[in-house]
């Protein structure tokens, strides 16, 4: 799952992406590794930002905390909502450093502008 900052998860009491991932874990019978990625910075909320602002805001916000857990494995990265893809892109860039066999993305919702 896409991690939250410790402060955000503490104030919220849960990580919505991890809740979704745990549901997939039960249905798909595959393990969830919530400690593979770590969110480093407490950034501004991205809900009101455009794509360029989101891309700048999210740079260097994640680190790969457990390379061995993903080496040569097929990864399904779970997030609740994809708006511009900036967060998922930043996470994928980190995950690639662990040499996974593949990375796929799953979101509950995707924001689309018409």
Please provide the spans of the model-predicted regions.
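Conserved PRPP/pyrophosphate-binding segment of the phosphoribosyltransferase/PRPP-pathway fold
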Residues: 1-76, 86-114
